[in-house]
């Protein structure tokens, strides 16, 4: 279901789930931020942007899990982008911001940029979050299905990027394919993932005709 309004406490829950994700021995691009709180504040800004842009969806009214995705051709208005800029600028000093920019500049263009260059349509997933109290209960599969079903309806692939091998493995388990990796020096790796649209389900009458 599409999310039109969201309490600040729920936005904070999402930010905390991202900012305090357990990377284990991995670095993750969380290292590009000056602190875990700064990463959480940036994600909160992203959630507000997705909310204003009409990109945010959830599994149910309980809000167990959230996903933000952009369909082919959808554009964000400046008003929607401002919360993301505020979240980024408000969470870092000028020096931290310059360091963040230098780290992000080390990576190659992502799969979405390659699709843009080739003028290929796709559905881009910018955020997937299962709130911490609902993790380990199958909600990641349920929330991803929202994007998968919409992409199948449109006949386009789903594209997503993540910054940890542990996350990448979960997405592959849930139907995505690893399309490539991008290294950001010693600060981590981004994994580009894709799920191609499922073949349309054939009707029983069509199957019977094929057998005649």
Model regions and ranges:
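Conserved beta-strand-loop-alpha-helix junction that forms the acyl-donor binding cleft
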Residues: 126-135, 159-169, 185-186, 196
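Conserved acetyl-CoA-binding loop-helix of GNAT-fold acetyltransferases
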Residues: 130, 136-149
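Conserved acyl-donor/pantetheine-binding loop and adjacent beta-alpha core of acyl/acetyltransferases
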Residues: 66-129
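Conserved active-site alpha-helix within GNAT-family acetyltransferase domains
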Residues: 141, 153-154, 164-181, 185
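Active-site rim helix/loop that mediates acceptor-substrate recognition in acyltransferases
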Residues: 33-56
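Conserved GNAT acetyl-CoA-binding A-motif
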Residues: 122-123, 150-163
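Conserved beta-hairpin
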Residues: 52-70
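A short beta-loop-alpha structural element at the N-terminal edge
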Residues: 1-16
């Amino acid at each position: 279901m599409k999310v039109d309004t969201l309490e600040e406490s729920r936005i904070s829950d999402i930010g905390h789930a991202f900012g305090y994700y357990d990377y284990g021995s991995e670095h993750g691009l969380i290292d590009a931020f000056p602190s875990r709180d700064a990463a959480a504040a940036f994600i909160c800004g992203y959630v507000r942007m997705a909310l204003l842009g009409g990109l945010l969806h959830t599994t149910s009214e309980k809000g167990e899990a959230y996903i933000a995705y952009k369909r082919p051709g959808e554009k964000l208005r400046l008003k929607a982008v401002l919360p993301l800029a505020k979240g980024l600028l408000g969470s870092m000093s000028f020096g931290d911001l310059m360091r963040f920019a230098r780290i992000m500049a080390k990576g190659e263009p992502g799969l979405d940029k390659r699709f843009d260059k080739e003028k290929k349509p796709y559905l881009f997933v910018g955020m997937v979050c299962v709130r911490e109290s609902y993790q380990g209960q199958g909600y990641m599969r349920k929330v991803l299905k929202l994007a998968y079903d919409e992409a199948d309806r449109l006949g386009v692939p789903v594209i997503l990027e993540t910054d940890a091998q542990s996350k990448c493995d979960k997405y592959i388990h849930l139907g995505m394919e690893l399309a490539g990796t991008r290294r950001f020096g010693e600060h981590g790796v981004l994994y580009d993932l894709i799920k191609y649209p499922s073949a349309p389900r054939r009707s029983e009458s069509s199957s019977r005709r094929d057998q005649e």
